[in-house]
Every structure is written in structure tokens, then in C-alpha cells.
UniProtKB/Swiss-Prot annotation:
Residues 1160-1170 have a biased composition (Basic residues). Residues 1085-1166 form the DAD domain. One of its GO terms (cellular component) is nucleoplasm. SMART domains: FH2. One of its GO terms (molecular function) is identical protein binding. Belongs to the formin homology family. Residues 491-647 form the FH1 domain. Self-associates via the FH2 domain. Binds to F-actin via its N-terminus. Binds to the cytoplasmic domain of CD21 via its C-terminus. Interacts with ROCK1 in a Src-dependent manner. Phosphorylated by ROCK1. Residues 648-1045 form the FH2 domain. This is FH1/FH2 domain-containing protein 1. Signal peptide: none annotated.
Length: 1197
């Protein structure tokens, strides 16, 4: 019985009682297995614990003969696979039926079985590694495997299973290919499988290649699958054409040659194959979106004698009715596309051929339908021969016959020219073709048409160009463009003779003007003398060390901001102002402060030094007076003014006690009149934060203080938490000590798996190499965990098990250690300083960091019941330690969720502050010592050079050494200046973050950067977890849309499923053992397939009678009962999926093309016709006039 145990604080702990079984499916081809044991035992699962931690206990309870690392949990009977990385509570949204059974008092069943990926890999290995009868048995069983587990289909597709089938089928005979086509047909019945075939063009190419097979059954099955593929979606027809062209290019044959060979009956094709072939061509042509693609397909067919084949079949008395219907549809589509409305009107109304759009400004090429059938001399039509051969566009459109050429409705200056070239060819009826002996006339006609088209386009372009010029001038004048207005309004036409008129020229002119140099201030010339060996010049050099630019460090940063604050506050001694602030050319010291003035107010207590007052203060009676520059600050008021009240809105008094955040509040005394900071327009970062609204009710519920309720529970229960300890104390202590300097365990695992060099340093990797678990330790821990699954592991044991769960741990650590084994001695001082300078800029301008601080401040103010202006950033170390009292999730987790809700475009913060994360690894105190040692070593090198100068040295060597030491001296002095200015900027940065001068002095750079780095690292890890959970939920919703769904349930084939009787349901997945319901469904499908369509009203996709033959039929258990060719004629299929496929094919072949007459095809050329229409029609009067040809007597054009 599923239950919920009561916790001491009154909240239920989600404990679910379920029944568990296992399924021995290590061999995917052993399809006769059933879940064991038959009487499923019960087990209690913790809903808040990840399932990966509970699977070992279930594995031991069942004694399953499965590998523990390959196990997965499947919900029965829905078949949903649970995510082992998540808990049941986290998957509650995906387990509605599971929890619905629990709410009814039932015990749902979980099945322990092999993971999908492992089973798919086993299938692929079996297919690749077997041959002969074993391969035949495997291919024969593959269809049933897809039937039994609907989740296996998408996994098989994603694991390159289609490529495996093609590779195996390419090297096999027609029997194996027949089994592969059966499995592929079952796979294509599922929406996931069909989408996989759509995305895998090699499968479509292979199916088209099989159309040239010598096996009639293989050809028929391939045609069926291609028919279903093309009919499934209109977008599949272009994919099929691409596959045909790819095969033709690879094999060196003509496109569509495989289908034409079937129509030529070279291999003795029967009427059924002919119907499937012509239907496939018609379905492909009906789905094409543009006219050029339509004519490309028809022209390729006509080149191979399609017209002669059509006439031969239509002229034969014994031609099959369905074949005659499909051939008539093909002829009607071609004539309708050419504009022969008289003969194709009835077929268009019945078949629903769409009309293609014919643009009016261009002339296109014609089809070559009559190249092989005989070309008549191109002639001009007689004046009196209009009748049925009248131009299509000469009559206005009516309701029943829309205009085939919209050129007559076009407007513009060129409409008159375009109207003359709309219909260049009369429409004639297509008859049987005769042999052609005048091929020159064909090319002559094509040449004359192109010449006429070029002349027409030239005239239209000139007219359109004039219109665009006038329109462009009007638009420019309306927009108020200064250049254009000057061009039109200028009284002197010769003032701008070269002003461009076209938009491109105007853009070039603006670009040229933008590139003209602007007047600049004169730059002082460099020193005329360059002495490389002498001391650097007296002018202040540019602060650049290698490729590191420190030039933004100004001279005003030579003085520490903290000392300035102390002087202004009266805390600095008078004699400190006389010290020199710089070394090597620094700015002069500031002037001493003026003597104290009588009447100045005393400083706030406690003063470390007697403050010298630098100005007078107003009398104290009124409330806080405005601060005067140079005067001492007034004592703090009783209640510090809240300068960021808009950040949190009105104060909400909490009704319950909440968990408190023990941060150190900042006492910000700056008001709105304070001067801006170097880092932003506001004096502090907190003043610039935007207000964030939080769900106070939810926070109050999550973080309600339960200290009074928890304490009695701890006293009543065990007073000490028990843990599973297996390691000896020495080993355990060594690991625990090592863990103090390493990141958290989950961070280490993620870093090792992703090779994240920022998460673990080189020292950490070397330490991990000494802490690797042995096989003996792993076995002991696993045995202890199985013996006590409810007792958590100790920290050392948990750490070792985490490392042991990483595959190839030793190899990873060694590889990583080698990768990080890199040091740059030359930049060991400059790079950390540059990183610190850049890191401060990155942190200040980071929008994610601001949002995190604002959100955390709003949450903390609500939980604390206060209105703090800010908090010290040192509290970021404790954010992950605070947990809510309901789900025991950390405050950092809720912070990530709130930030993602407020700012979905926010980043992970860690990747945007790489400079600060690098600074966290640098000891800046040691860096200062290294800088001093570098100065001493530089001076000692100079002394050594002087002593060496007394001995014999070549002048060139001496010059080189002198130049080298001079450069070193200059660079060391520059390093000293950079170090001083960067440190002073860091102190100013701390003041901007709200620190007081006294607190800023105690902050170490390394500790500050380390705090931010650890917080950013934990924030990134937690954010990835939140995003992963959101992605899994979204993936589950998308997966559920097609999970187990068959193509018969889609809108395209909905008519097929709707035709079935009420007692017949299309199965989602066929089971391995037939039952009474399956037998009834089977009989109902047989009666449906054998019934005539006249008995009931059918949709257009399923009209007609079912053919007696089927792709495959098996009555025995194994494939050895009969060959595929023999079973093809054995009658109706015995497999329900085969019946569904046959029903789909019959619905496609018995239905006409898609009713899309209201849509027009796109095309890039105008007035393109078929080859038959082009070569059998004469040139019209418009074309003859455009060419300048006169109709002299006896002259034929």
C-alpha cells in the first residue's frame, strides 16, 4: 500500500509502495520472455531520493540476472522509462497515471529491465556481426521487436539504426532485403520512425535503388513504402526527388530511370507494380510547390519515352482500370499545367489538380515532350484558326476557370509590354507522337523564343527602371533626405553633376563621406633620438606589458582611495601627506590640508587619531544638514536612511517565523546627491539595482521556521546520525582531509566528466590521483550499501563511490594533469594583475550578477523582515547551506529558479567572469613579494654586468646585454606602477560594493575572488540542474505527442482509421502473444480488406478494392517455412501491421492527387510549358512580332 510517513514536524515524507518485477531482455531478439517473478514483491521507494541510489536495492531484492549499470526502471503498463538521475517527485508531472493509481489505493508495478540504449546497441552489434541463418533470424525478429516496445523505435532511429539496416541490406540478397523492408515498414508506421526516415535521406535513396531489383516482392514493398512516405507529408515529395537525383548522379543513370524501367516491363512487371509506379509519380508531382520542379520531373520522364508508354497502355484494351486512371491523371496534370483547359477541365475537377502561378514579366523554357515523339515545323497560327486553340489568357477569368496567367491584372508602366507577351503559344490537343526528323527546328524554336524573351525583358526593364527612378525620387523627398533635397532644390544644376541617382550609389556616397578624416588635435612628434641601450625617455610611457594593455590606469589612481577617505574623514595623520606616493615618476603629493578651524564638529566615535578639521560645519540643531565638501561627516542618525526603498516595495509583515539570513548589513550613508563612482553612475552598486518582486507567500511557505518542531524529533529519535563506514580510519581521515581543499563531490564529478579545467586545479588533480578507489574498496562499499540501503554512506565512502562511478577515472586524471601542466614564468606577475583589472570590469557590467544580488536581497529582506540596502558579498559563501523546510532544497536552487523566471536570458555567471575565477588561484601577497624579488634580481643583474664589463667582452655582446637589462629595468618599473594602480582600483571597487574603508582594508584579494568563484561555480552547477529538469519536462511533453503514435492517427491518414468498423481499433503496438481481442481485430481487418468499396461510403484515400497479393505472409514461427517469393502469393497477410500498411497503400493508390487547385505553384521563370506543348505548337503572333519576323508567303518560322 502506498503511504506517506509522518515526519516529526508534521509534513509527510513521500514514500511510495510499489510492486517490482524484472524482465530478462539482455538478448533483444529473445522475444518470448515475461516479467519475473509472477507474484511481484512489494517495495517502498523514497520519492525524494534519486532512483539511481535505489536501483541497487531493487536489483538485490529481485535477484535479477541483469548488469546493475545497465538497469532501468519502466512503469507498467504505460511503458514509460523513469529517469534514474531524478527522483519520483521530480518526475511527478510525467507520472500522472502512476500517482493516480496510488491515490486509488493501488500499488503500481515497476519493471527492472535493460536500458534502451544498451538494447539498441546489442541489436546493432548483432546485425553487424552475424551472417547466414543467424542474420536471417535476427532480421526476421526485428519487426516484432519494434512492435513490442514503442519506445525502442525513436532510440533505434537516433542510434543510426537506419544506416545499419541500409548497410546490411546493400550486401544481402533479396530475401534479407525483404525482411529489412518488413522491419522498415513497421518502423514507418510509427510517427517517430517516419520522422526518422524523413531526416535520413540515405533510406529514401536505398528504397528508390531497390525499385530496380530483380525481385518482384522487393520492388513492390519498396514502392509501397515510398508511396506512404510521399503521401505522409507534402514536404516529403521534394525529399524523394532529391533522393532520385542523388542516386542518378552516383550511378551515372538518368533520373527516374528505375521507375521508367518498371513501366517498360523489362522484368515482367504486373499491373500492380505499374499502378504503384504511376501513382508514386502522380503523388510526387501533386505535392511539388513550384512549376519548375514539376517540369523538371516531367521533362526527365519524357526524355525516356514516357509519352510513348502512356499511349501504349491507354491504347491497349486489356489495360487495368486503376492503371488507366492513374495514366489519365498524369496526362491531365501535364495538359492542365500547359494550359490546355478544354481537355483537362473534367479531370481537373475530379482529380483536384492545382493551378500553378505564371508570372507575367519573364519568358521561360518549355518542356521537351515531343523531342522523341516527332517535332512539327514551328509555324505562326492562322488568323482564322482560333477556336479551341485560342490563347488561354485571352478570355477573362470566370468562377469555374480561374485565369492561368495573372499578367492581365498587373499594373505598372510596363503592363502594356507585358500584356503583349503573355500567351506566345496556342493551346492544341495532344495526340499520338510521330518520329521526329527535324531536330534543327527544335533548337531553332528554342533560340527564337529566347531571343524574343530577351527583347521583351529588356523593354520591360527599361520601363520599370524609369518608374523606379521616379518612385525613388518621391520617396527620398518625402523622407526629407538632405542629399536628395539639395539635388532637387538646388538652383544650379551643375553644382552637383555627379550626385548618384540609384540607391547603391547613394549608399556608396554616404560611406565615402563617413570615411573622410575629421580634424584632430595635433599630436606631439616622437623624440628624434632613439637610444635603445640608454634609459627610457622622461615622458610617461604607455602602460603595456607584452600584449596586456594597462593604459586605462590613470595617474589619479596612484593614490589609494582608502587613504583619501581617511583624510576626508579626519582619520589620517598630518605627516602622511608628505610621503611620496609614487616610484619612478609618479604624480606629486597632494598639498597638506588647511589648519583646523575653530568650531568644527567632532568626528563620530571612536576616532583612532585626532581628526584635523578642514572646514566649518553648520550648527547641529536642525535634522541632518547637507554634507559640505571637505567637512567631517555627521554622526550616524538613529535610523539609517533607506536609500533603496524602491527595491523591495512595501514591507510585508510575515505571519509566520521564517528562516533568517545572518548577513552583515551595509550602512550606506550616501544620498542621492553623492558623486558618481568610477564604476558607474551611482555611488554604490546597491543604488543601481533594479527592484525585484518575489512571491512572498511561497517563500513564507518554503522557509517557515520549524526549529521548535524539529528539536523534539531529534531528542526522541536517534541522537546521532548513523552512516555506513567501511574504510579504515587512516584511509578515511586522509580522504576527509583532502576533501577540505577540493570542490564539492558533485562539482568534481561534473568537472571530471566535462574536463572543466576551471573547476579543479592541477594540485587538486594530483591529490585525486592519490585518492583513487581500489576495486576491493568498491566491492566492500557496494556490499555494505546493499546490506543497509537506507543508511547513507560516510563522506569518504560517498566520495570513493562517486569517483568509482566515473568511467576511466585514472585515464581522465592523467590526461587532465598533462593538459594543465603549463606555466608562463614571463607573465606570472602581469597576468594576475591584468585579470584583476578586467575581472572588476566584468563583474560591474554583468547583468546576471546584478539580478542575482537584487533577487537575493529581496528574498532576504522578506525572510528577515527588514529593509536592508545591501549585504556584504562574503555571505555568498553561505547561500548553498540554507535549505527550505519543505523539500530540503537549498536557497541557491530557489535563487536560480527565481533568476531564470525573472531573466530567462541570463547566463551562468561563471563563464562571464573568467578573469576573477583565475584571480582566485593567485596569492597576491606572494605576488607582491615576487615583484620585490624581481626588482632585486634586476639590480643584481646590472651589478653583474658592470663587473663583467671590466673583462674582455665583444662590443656586440655587451650592447645586447646592456639593451636587455635596460628593457628589464623599464619593464620592472612599469610593473611596479601597474601593481600599485591595480591595487588602488581594487580598494575603490570595494567601496563601490558598499564596504567601509576599514572593512575594505581587511579584504584580501584572493579571498574575495575565491568567494565569487565558488559561488559562481555552484550557481552554474545548480542552474544547469534547473535547466536540465526544465528541458526534461519539455522533452517529455514533446515526446508524448508522438510516443507510440502511428501514422494512421495523423490527419493525413485519418480517413484510413476512420473507415474501420467500430469494433476495430488500430493498434499502437502489437503484442507478442495473440489474444481474443487480436483475433477479432484480425478478422475485422480481413473483412474490411476483402469488401468492395461500393458497399459503403469511403474517403478518397481508401476507395477501391484490396489487391489479393501482399508483401509478405508468414504462417510459421521462423523464416524457413517459405521463401518471401512464395509467401507473396499465399493470400491475405497474417500480421496486423502488414494489413495496416496494405490499407494505407490502397488508400493512396485509389485516391486522386491532392485537392489543391486553389493554390498556385511558385516559379522563377514565366510561361514555361512542357516539351510536348513547346515543340508541337507554333509561334504566336506576339512572338513573331517581338522577333521582327514578317509573315511572307511561303515562309514558315
Amino acid at each position: 500500500m502506498a503511504g506517506e510517513e509522518e515526519r516529526g514536524d508534521g509534513d509527510p515524507v513521500s514514500v511510495v509502495t510499489v510492486r517490482v518485477q524484472y524482465l530478462e531482455d539482455t538478448d533483444p531478439f529473445a522475444c518470448a520472455n515475461f516479467p519475473e517473478p509472477r507474484r511481484a514483491p512489494t517495495c517502498s521507494l523514497d520519492g525524494a531520493l534519486p532512483l539511481s541510489a535505489q536501483i541497487p536495492a531493487l536489483h538485490r531484492l529481485l535477484g535479477a540476472p541483469l548488469k546493475l549499470e545497465d538497469c532501468a526502471l519502466q512503469v507498467s503498463p504505460s511503458g514509460y522509462y523513469l529517469d534514474p538521475e531524478l527522483s519520483l517527485e521530480e518526475q511527478r508531472e510525467m507520472l500522472e497515471g502512476f500517482y493516480e493509481e496510488i491515490s486509488k489505493g493501488r500499488k503500481p508495478t515497476l519493471i527492472l529491465r535493460t536500458q534502451l540504449s544498451v538494447r539498441v546497441n546489442a541489436i546493432l552489434e548483432k546485425l553487424y556481426g552475424s551472417s547466414g541463418p543467424e542474420l536471417r533470424r535476427s532480421l526476421f525478429s526485428l519487426k516484432q521487436i519494434f512492435q513490442e516496445d514503442k519506445d525502442l523505435v525513436p532510440e533505434f532511429v537516433h542510434s543510426e539504426g537506419l544506416s545499419c539496416l541500409i548497410r546490411v541490406g546493400a550486401a544481402a540478397d533479396h530475401n534479407y532485403q525483404s525482411y529489412i523492408l518488413r522491419a522498415l515498414g513497421q518502423l514507418m508506421l510509427f510517427v517517430d520512425g517516419m520522422l526518422g526516415v524523413v531526416a535520413h535521406s540515405e533510406t529514401v535513396q536505398w528504397l528508390y535503388t531497390l525499385c530496380a531489383s530483380l525481385s518482384r516482392l522487393v520492388v513492390k514493398t519498396a514502392l509501397k513504402l515510398l508511396l506512404v512516405f510521399v503521401e505522409y507529408s507534402e514536404n516529403n515529395a521534394p525529399l524523394f526527388i532529391q533522393a532520385v537525383n542523388a542516386v542518378a548522379s552516383a550511378t551515372g543513370t538518368l533520373p527516374w530511370a528505375n521507375l521508367v524501367s518498371i513501366l517498360e516491363e523489362k522484368n515482367g512487371a504486373d499491373a500492380e507494380l505499374l499502378v504503384y509506379t504511376v501513382t508514386l509519380i502522380n503523388k510526387t508531382l501533386a505535392a511539388l510547390p513550384d512549376q519548375d520542379s514539376f517540369y523538371d520531373v516531367t521533362d526527365a520522364l519524357e526524355q525516356q519515352g514516357m509519352e510513348a508508354l502512356v499511349q501504349r497502355f491507354l491504347g491497349t484494351a486489356g489495360t487495368d482500370v486503376d492503371l488507366r486512371t492513374q495514366l489519365t491523371l498524369y496526362e491531365s496534370a501535364l495538359r492542365l499545367e500547359d494550359g490546355d483547359m478544354e481537355e483537362a477541365a473534367a479531370a481537373a475537377a475530379a482529380g483536384g489538380r492545382r493551378e500553378r502561378r505564371k508570372p507575367s514579366s519573364e519568358e521561360g523554357k518549355r518542356s521537351r515532350r515531343s523531342l522523341e515523339g516527332g517535332g512539327c515545323p514551328v509555324r505562326a497560327p492562322e488568323p482564322g484558326s482560333t477556336g479551341s486553340a485560342s490563347p488561354v489568357g485571352s478570355t477573362p477569368s470566370t468562377g469555374s476557370a480561374p485565369p492561368t496567367n495573372p499578367a492581365f491584372s498587373s499594373t505598372g508602366p510596363a503592363s502594356g509590354l507585358l500584356r503583349t507577351s503573355v500567351n506566345l503559344f496556342p493551346t492544341i490537343s495532344v495526340g499520338p507522337s510521330v518520329d521526329s526528323s527535324c531536330e534543327r527546328s527544335v533548337y531553332k524554336a528554342r533560340f527564337l523564343e529566347n531571343v524574343a524573351a530577351a527583347e521583351t525583358e529588356k523593354q520591360a526593364a527599361l520601363a520599370q527602371g524609369r518608374a523606379e527612378t521616379l518612385a525613388g525620387a518621391t520617396v527620398d523627398d518625402t523622407d526629407g533626405s538632405s542629399g536628395t533635397r539639395e539635388l532637387w532644390d538646388s538652383p544650379e544644376p551643375a553644382s552637383a553633376p555627379r550626385t548618384p541617382q540609384s540607391p547603391v550609389s547613394r549608399i556608396l556616397l554616404r560611406t565615402q563621406r563617413s570615411l573622410e578624416p575629421e580634424p584632430k588635435k595635433p599630436v606631439s612628434p616622437p623624440s628624434p633620438k632613439a637610444e635603445p641601450i640608454q634609459e627610457p625617455p622622461t615622458c610617461v610611457p604607455k602602460l603595456c606589458i607584452g600584449d596586456l594593455d594597462f593604459s586605462d590606469l590613470g595617474e589619479d589612481e596612484d593614490q589609494d582611495t582608502l587613504n583619501v577617505e581617511s583624510v576626508e574623514a579626519g582619520k589620517a595623520s598630518p605627516f602622511l601627506s608628505s610621503l611620496s606616493p609614487s616610484l619612478s615618476g609618479g604624480p606629486p603629493p597632494p598639498p597638506p590640508p588647511p589648519p583646523p578651524i575653530t568650531g568644527s564638529c567632532p568626528p563620530p566615535p571612536p576616532p583612532p587619531l585626532p581628526p584635523p578639521a578642514t572646514g566649518s560645519c553648520p550648527p547641529p540643531p536642525p535634522p541632518p544638514p547637507p554634507p559640505i565638501i571637505g567637512s567631517c561627516p555627521p554622526p550616524p542618525p538613529l535610523a539609517a536612511p533607506f536609500t533603496h526603498s524602491a527595491l523591495d516595495g512595501p514591507r510585508h509583515p510575515t505571519k509566520r517565523k521564517t528562516v533568517k539570513l545572518f548577513w552583515r548589513e551595509l550602512k550606506l550613508t550616501g544620498g542621492p546627491g553623492c558623486s558618481r563612482s568610477r564604476f558607474g553612475p551611482c555611488p554604490t552598486l546597491w543604488a543601481s539595482l533594479e527592484p525585484v518582486s518575489v512571491d512572498t507567500a511561497r517563500l513564507e511557505h518554503l522557509f517557515e521556521s520549524r526549529a521548535k518542531d524539529v528539536l523534539p524529533t531529534k531528542k526522541a529519535g536517534e541522537g546521532r546520525r548513523t552512516m555506513t563506514v567501511v574504510l579504515d580510519p587512516k584511509r578515511s581521515n586522509a580522504i576527509n582531509i583532502g576533501l577540505t581543499t577540493l570542490p564539492p563531490v558533485h562539482v568534481i564529478k561534473a568537472a571530471l566528466l566535462n574536463f572543466d579545467e576551471f573547476a579543479v586545479s592541477k594540485d587538486g588533480i594530483e591529490k585525486l590521483l592519490t585518492m583513487m578507489p581500489t576495486e576491493e574498496e568498491r566491492q566492500k562499499i557496494e556490499e555494505a550499501q546493499l546490506a543497509n540501503p537506507d543508511v547513507p554512506l560516510g563522506p569518504a565512502e560517498n566520495f570513493l563511490m562517486t569517483l568509482a562511478s566515473i568511467g576511466g577515472l585514472a585515464a581522465r586524471l592523467q590526461l587532465w594533469a598533462f593538459k594543465l601542466d603549463y606555466e608562463s614564468m614571463e607573465r606570472e606577475i602581469a597576468e594576475p594583475l591584468f585579470d584583476l583589472k578586467v575581472g572588476m570590469e566584468q563583474l560591474v557590467h554583468n547583468a546576471t550578477f546584478r539580478c542575482i544580488l537584487a533577487t537575493l536581497l529581496a528574498v532576504g529582506n522578506f525572510l528577515n523582515g527588514s529593509q536592508s540596502s545591501g549585504f556584504e558579498l562574503s555571505y555568498l559563501e553561505k547561500v548553498s547551506e540554507v535549505k527550505d523546510t519543505v523539500r530540503r532544497q537549498s536557497l541557491l536552487y530557489h535563487l536560480c529558479s527565481l533568476v531564470l523566471q525573472t531573466r530567462p536570458d541570463s547566463s551562468d555567471l561563471y563563464s562571464e567572469i573568467p578573469a576573477l575565477t583565475r584571480c582566485a588561484k593567485v596569492d597576491f601577497e606572494q605576488l607582491t613579494e615576487n615583484l620585490g624579488q624581481l626588482e632585486c634580481r634586476s639590480q643584481a643583474a646590472e651589478d653583474s654586468l658592470r663587473s663583467l664589463a671590466k673583462h674582455e667582452l665583444s662590443p656586440a655582446l655587451r650592447a645586447r646585454l646592456t639593451h636587455f637589462l635596460a628593457q628589464c629595468t623599464r619593464r620592472v618599473a612599469m610593473l611596479r606602477v601597474v601593481h600599485r594602480r591595480v591595487c588602488n582600483r581594487f580598494h575603490a571597487f570595494l567601496l563601490y560594493l558598499g564596504y567601509t574603508p576599514q572593512a575594505a582594508r581587511d579584504v584580501r584579494i584572493m579571498q574575495f575572488c575565491h568567494t565569487l568563484r565558488e559561488f559562481a561555480l555552484e550557481y552554474r552547477t545548480c542552474r544547469e540542474r534547473v535547466l536540465q529538469q526544465q528541458q526534461k519536462r519539455a522533452t517529455y511533453r514533446e515526446r508524448n505527442k508522438t510516443r507510440g503514435r502511428m501514422i494512421t492517427e495523423t490527419e493525413k491518414f485519418s480517413g484510413v482509421a476512420g473507415e474501420a468498423p467500430n469494433n476495430l481499433s488500430v493498434p499502437v503496438a502489437v503484442g507478442s502473444g495473440p489474444g481474443q481481442g487480436d483475433t477479432d481485430n484480425h478478422a475485422s481487418m480481413k473483412s474490411l480488406l476483402t469488401s468492395r468499396p461500393e458497399d459503403a461510403t469511403h474517403s478518397r484515400r481508401s476507395r477501391g478494392m484490396v489487391q489479393s497479393s501482399s508483401p509478405v505472409s508468414h504462417t510459421a514461427v521462423g523464416p524457413s517455412a517459405a521463401s518471401p517469393e512464395e509467401t507473396a502469393a499465399s493470400g491475405l497477410p497474417t500480421d496486423t501491421s502488414d494489413e495496416i500498411m496494405d490499407l494505407l497503400v490502397q488508400s493512396v493508390t485509389k485516391s486522386g492527387p491532392r485537392a489543391l487547385a486553389a493554390r498556385e505553384r511558385k516559379r522563377s521563370r514565366g510561361n514555361r510549358k512542357s516539351l510536348r506543348r513547346t515543340l508541337k505548337s507554333g509561334l504566336g503572333d506576339d512572338l513573331v512580332q517581338a522577333l521582327g519576323l514578317s509573315k511572307a508567303p511561303g515562309l514558315e518560322v
